[in-house]
């Protein structure tokens, strides 16, 4: 093994090795950068994500102070290439940087002969050492490169999953990660090997500690050992495979990250709130001479700096300062910056959420989207900030960010249906967890075959809330949802169900919202009093890193394909409420401001709750009059439930017993079977992902017949009033409810029983919210316009009676008459009760027709 010394004056054949001192120096944020030299002459497929230039775009020609300190580690794609690379180093082809300690990339590869776990050093390229070479240490530490190499090799070859211990299968005799490597080679896909950090700890705790404390050095050795194994198994395999570590033993809260974590591997959980566009990052630069047109050899980017050749390398030219960058011959890598924010359950009392920038590279780009709750494993880094763009002086305060190694979506209870990291070939990273997931799916399918699964799901939804069974059934339908339909003509029909809860204070509305927020696959909980229009949809802001104008997603956009819970819906501003019209029907958010014209997806179900304006619901008034919501918005809700607090001795006693029983254990109470929260979430998630029910012929006939029957109720023979009891939006709601009920049974077909139950749920909601109290019948005009058909008829009759009275009693151009006198005359002629405000409304209608003129309390015919 040829190691590189720190001096610049050796012959290169046998430089002195770097030996650690007895007292190990700690890896501080900046001195740790000396553990890896620039390596400006190296080429090949490398670990770009660990040697990124900076998360903040800057010119590569800027100084090293503007970029993160560690260089890009570019490991060769095979054992032979690694030996050739070391020969190039020791042979003088790429001379070492003076006064720079040894690079940890100079790692001895394991022996190619036999299955020995102890690696042998290569003696290549003029001056290599033999088997008794002096141990090589990572600069500033007591980590022996040979020991780490051997430990990693033993781990990859021999680690076996404890769950495979009892299985009699010849395939399981091979190590877990050797099987994963073979799978990658067989599928010829996947450029990464996911390594569970728990497995590393179980196999070798010392290796785990070194990997967490010195991730750059240890992971570079990991990659070289991995590619050496790949080269033995498949010598012709050309792709470079990287190691991605995940699932550390401890996860750090965002607000607990401190300077002692810099340059260490950390695991954090949070929610993605913003993703930047994909940024091309220069990795290899090619220059062309402006005098002779000669193209230079590719120049590697070293810590954000591009070393431009000063002299043309062509013997016949040798022109100075004539080289220019050729962009279309350079090599770029994908880079993306995401903003990670603390989840609400991790924010302490009275605190505000903390955020951190995360740098994604290559295959990790677009692995997460805004609104996802993720766990990120990466290296906590610090970057200096210049005082000015043209000055090399830097500030004493550094910017911190995380260099991402692995990303996965959290919520294990959702069976990974939306939680696995997006890759080009997801089959390449499958492990033995597939068997575990298959067992859980079988259990869920057995649950779906139970005859009482509908009632059991209803009892499992918010079991601490007493009764409200029909409300819970409607909320269950919202969680399961219907099928979104898109026709070839471009027309689309939403599959999400919107529900509004209206009721008296203290009727568990907010608790239902909180429980739904826990169950929804993704979503945001917000309050109407503290929400603005742009906070709900999207707003334009300046990117703090690039200074560009960017769109920040609001609550509805972050809840895409989930449930957005809005509390205190009645207290929202009119401007904020008006933004919901497009979201609730077209499920998009259109933005046209600050030069940005965009349409964002907001395919979310809206669950809102509102209190009456007078604190108590007034049954004599309509829903619109009680909560002062515009009819155009109210009609977009599929189900509107009234939850009223009515005084009843028997009901009050049962409710009190239920609430008291929650605070102590009573062995005499018989508990009904319910599903626990993880099982319920998994059940809902699997149904939404894999069950796509279609309408059967019988169900379609029942839908048509039931809708026509509902319309007939408002057109009873002999009645002069034509009441609208159903609209086209109701039949769309019925289809969505029927599909959701079929999903609860894991059925691919919507049956007649689903349609019948959907009609019952809709009628229960309509009887509460759309019943005309004057006639006792359902009148959809209450929802569509806020005025029932009977009320409209009464107003028309009053206008006609007032017009006749004015024509009879008042002369054209004669003296005016007081309103009180008109009111008394109308009361004498009419049997119905008439109030002064009713008369004012009728006279206002006549004034718009030009029949009368109103002056204060006097009326004059014109």
From Swiss-Prot:
Annotated ATP binding sites: 503-510
Alphabetical UniProt keywords: ATP-binding, Cell cycle, DNA replication, DNA-binding, Helicase, Hydrolase, Metal-binding, Nucleotide-binding, Nucleus, Zinc, Zinc-finger
Reaction(s) catalysed by this chain's protein: ATP + H2O = ADP + phosphate + H(+)
Compositionally biased intervals (Gly residues): 1-12
GO terms for cellular component: chromatin; MCM complex; nucleus; THO complex
Any GO BP annotation: mitotic DNA replication initiation
Molecular function terms from GO: ATP binding; ATP hydrolysis activity; DNA helicase activity; single-stranded DNA binding; zinc ion binding
Primary localization: nucleus
Sequence motif: Arginine finger, positions: 635-638
UniProt cross-references to Gene3D superfamilies, sorted A to Z: 2.20.28.10, mini-chromosome maintenance (MCM) complex, chain A, domain 1, Nucleic acid-binding proteins, P-loop containing nucleotide triphosphate hydrolases, Winged helix-like DNA-binding domain superfamily/Winged helix DNA-binding domain
Keyword Cell cycle among UniProt keywords: yes
PROSITE patterns: MCM_1 (PS00847), MCM_2 (PS50051)
Similarity comment: Belongs to the MCM family.
Quaternary structure note: Component of the minichromosome maintenance (MCM) complex, a heterotetramer composed of MCM2, MCM3, MCM4, MCM5, MCM6 and MCM7.
Protein function: Probable component of the MCM2-7 complex (MCM complex) that may function as a DNA helicase and which is essential to undergo a single round of replication initiation and elongation per cell cycle in eukaryotic cells.
Protein name (Swiss-Prot/TrEMBL): DNA replication licensing factor MCM4
Organism this protein belongs to: Oryza sativa subsp. japonica
The organism's taxonomic lineage, starting at the top: Eukaryota, Viridiplantae, Streptophyta, Embryophyta, Tracheophyta
């Amino acid at each position: 093994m040829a190691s590189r010394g720190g001096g610049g004056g050796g012959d290169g054949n046998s430089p002195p090795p770097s030996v650690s001192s007895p007292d190990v120096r700690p890896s501080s944020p900046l001195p740790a950068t000396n553990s890896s030299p620039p390596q400006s002459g190296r080429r090949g497929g490398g670990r770009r994500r660990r040697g990124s230039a900076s998360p903040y775009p800057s010119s590569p020609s800027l100084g090293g102070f503007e970029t993160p300190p560690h260089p890009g580690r570019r490991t060769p794609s095979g054992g032979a290439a690694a030996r050739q690379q070391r020969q190039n180093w020791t042979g003088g082809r790429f001379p070492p940087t003076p006064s720079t300690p040894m690079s940890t990339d100079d790692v001895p590869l394991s022996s190619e002969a036999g299955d020995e776990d102890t690696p042998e050093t290569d003696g290549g390229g003029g001056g290599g050492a033999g088997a008794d070479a002096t141990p090589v240490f990572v600069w500033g530490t007591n980590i022996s490169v040979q020991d780490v190499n051997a430990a990693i090799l033993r781990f990859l070859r021999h680690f076996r999953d404890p769950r495979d211990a009892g299985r009699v299968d010849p395939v399981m005799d091979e190590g877990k990660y050797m099987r994963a490597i073979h799978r990658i080679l067989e599928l010829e896909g996947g450029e990464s090997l996911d390594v569970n950090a728990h497995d590393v700890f179980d196999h070798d705790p010392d290796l785990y500690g070194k990997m967490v404390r010195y991730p750059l050095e240890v992971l570079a050795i990991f990659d070289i050992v991995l590619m050496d194994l790949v080269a033995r198994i498949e010598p012709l395999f050309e792709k470079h495979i990287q190691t991605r570590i995940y699932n550390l033993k401890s996860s750090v809260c965002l607000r607990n990250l401190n300077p002692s974590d810099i340059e260490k591997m950390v695991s954090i959980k949070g929610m993605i709130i913003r993703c930047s566009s994909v940024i091309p990052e220069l990795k290899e630069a090619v220059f062309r001479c402006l005098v002779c047109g000669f193209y230079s050899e590719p120049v590697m980017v070293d810590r954000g700096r591009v070393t431009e050749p000063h002299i043309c390398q062509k013997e016949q030219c040798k022109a100075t300062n004539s080289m220019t960058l050729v962009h279309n011959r350079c090599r770029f890598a994908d880079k993306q910056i995401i903003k990670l924010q603390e989840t609400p359950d991790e924010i302490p009392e009275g605190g505000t959420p903390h955020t951190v920038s995360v740098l994604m590279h290559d295959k990790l780009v677009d692995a997460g989207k805004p609104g996802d709750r993720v766990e990120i494993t990466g290296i906590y880094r610090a970057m200096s900030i210049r005082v000015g763009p043209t000055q090399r002086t830097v500030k004493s305060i550094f910017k911190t960010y995380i260099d991402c190694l692995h990303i996965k979506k959290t919520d294990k209870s959702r069976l990974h249906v939306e939680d696995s990291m997006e890759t080009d070939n997801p089959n390449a990273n499958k492990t033995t967890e597939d068997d575990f997931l298959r067992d859980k799916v079988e259990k869920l399918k057995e649950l779906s075959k139970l005859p009482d699964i509908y009632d059991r799901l209803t009892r499992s939804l918010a079991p601490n809330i007493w009764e409200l069974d029909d409300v819970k059934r409607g909320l269950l339908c919202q969680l399961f949802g219907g099928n979104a339909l898109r026709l070839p003509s471009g027309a689309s029909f939403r599959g999400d169900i919107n529900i509004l809860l209206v009721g008296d204070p203290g009727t568990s509305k907010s608790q239902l919202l909180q429980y739904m927020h826990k169950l929804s696959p993704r979503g945001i909980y917000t309050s109407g009093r503290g929400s603005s229009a742009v906070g709900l949809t999207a707003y334009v802001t300046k990117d703090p890193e690039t200074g560009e104008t960017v769109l920040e997603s609001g609550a509805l956009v972050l809840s895409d394909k989930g449930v957005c819970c809005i509390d205190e819906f009645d207290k929202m501003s009119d401007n904020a409420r008006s933004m919901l019209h497009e979201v609730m029907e077209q499920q998009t958010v259109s933005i046209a401001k600050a030069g940005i014209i965009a349409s964002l997806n907001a395919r979310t179900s809206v669950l809102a709750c509102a209190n009456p304006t007078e604190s108590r619901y007034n049954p004599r008034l309509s829903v619109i009059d009680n909560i002062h919501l515009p009819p155009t918005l109210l009609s977009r809700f599929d189900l509107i439930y009234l939850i009223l607090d009515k005084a009843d001795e028997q009901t009050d006693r049962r409710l009190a017993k239920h609430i008291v029983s929650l605070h102590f254990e009573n062995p005499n109470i018989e508990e009904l079977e319910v599903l626990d929260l993880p099982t319920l979430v998994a059940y809902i998630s699997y149904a939404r992902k894999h069950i796509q029910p279609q309408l059967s012929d019988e169900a379609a006939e029942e839908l048509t017949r039931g809708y026509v029957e509902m319309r007939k109720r408002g057109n009873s023979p002999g009645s002069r009033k034509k009441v609208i009891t159903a609209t086209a939006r109701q039949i769309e709601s019925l289809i969505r409810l029927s599909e959701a009920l079929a999903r609860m049974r894991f059925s691919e077909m919507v049956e007649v029983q689903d349609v019948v139950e959907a009609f019952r749920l809709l009628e229960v909601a309509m009887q509460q919210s759309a019943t005309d109290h004057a006639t006792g019948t359902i009148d959809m005009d209450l929802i569509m316009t806020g005025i029932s058909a009977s009320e409209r008829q009464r107003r028309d009759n009053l206008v006609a009676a007032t017009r006749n009275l004015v024509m009879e009693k008042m002369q054209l151009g004669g003296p005016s008459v007081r309103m009180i006198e008109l009111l008394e005359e109308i009361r004498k002629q009419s049997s119905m009760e008439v109030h002064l405000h009713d008369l004012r409304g009728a006279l206002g209608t006549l004034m718009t027709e030009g029949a009368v003129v109103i002056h204060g309390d006097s009326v004059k015919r014109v």
